């Protein structure tokens, strides 16, 4: 799953700043949020995440920083419900669930993923 993605991608921006992007970890985290919190079937979640990740091959610093700025939960909700899902007149809650950090730690450990998906150097 997510063979097009890999971890430990070093990216240097135009201004010379560098980061390490764990794109495979990020893809699996999106998949995990969609299947765990939204109860999407794995096939549906995999298809949506793979399509999204295809748009950042090869990944840029803008992709990595943008993903880290909004967070995995928010990005998964965008993938599921689209832009504006957090507006008050929608039924979707934009807040991370109370158990999100604990879930993240368990999920990354269970699946042999990096602890986070971005490292600023």
What are these regions (language model features)?
Residues 1-121:
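C-terminal alpha-helical interaction appendages
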